[in-house]
Amino acid sequence: MDIVTIDFETYYDREYSLSKMTTEAYLRDKRFEVIGVAIKINDGKTCWYENMDEAFNDLPTNYCVLAHNTIFDGSIFRWKYRKEPKFWLDTMSMARPKHNLTTGCSLSALSKYYKLGTKGTEVLHSIGKRKADFTPQELKAYAEYCINDVELTYKLFKKLSKGFPLSELMVIDQTLRMFINPTVELDKELLVNHLSSIKHNKQQ
């Protein structure tokens, strides 16, 4: 199965951010905007896209999606662009058992711990900027930042996956699916009876 590593860069400001809101509230807010996405297929070249119609043209038929904090990137991938991979992978979830109480599970901390490279800081300069607000030079720097994040995530996955139990990967996938692609099963008979009760009470 092919591994598609992704990282979305999105608009945020001092009030509208993941530090102030839940992931779901942030993604469903009317202020949400994708600036761009970096995509790497297996160990191929990582590419940056600002046009989402072009971004997903070359996805393999049989693939899994890898990200660092897949709850966020995976939800954008599924909710906004209706893409459905066969499997979800998440380096943050993979790192938690070993690093949550020590190194921490940020991509920056883990990259430093495993000597994979350095995570950039360009995201700190993008606060309050819509895509239209970026100069070409700023957007180029942001693209390089995003591409680097994808490269670090893929390298981290290669480190963490050595000896990582398949059963645990399946638990991670199932846990992510409960958020990214939730399924609600309704009791039709109970709802019909409840509706009848409401109608009856209104008539009295």
Q: Which residues does each PLM region occupy?
A:
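Active-site neighborhoods of enzyme catalytic cores
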Residues: 23
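Conserved DEDDh/DEDDy metal-dependent 3′-5′ exonuclease domain
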Residues: 2-4, 13-20, 28-159
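Mixed-charge, glycine-rich, non-catalytic linkers/tails in nucleic-acid processing enzymes
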Residues: 85, 125-204
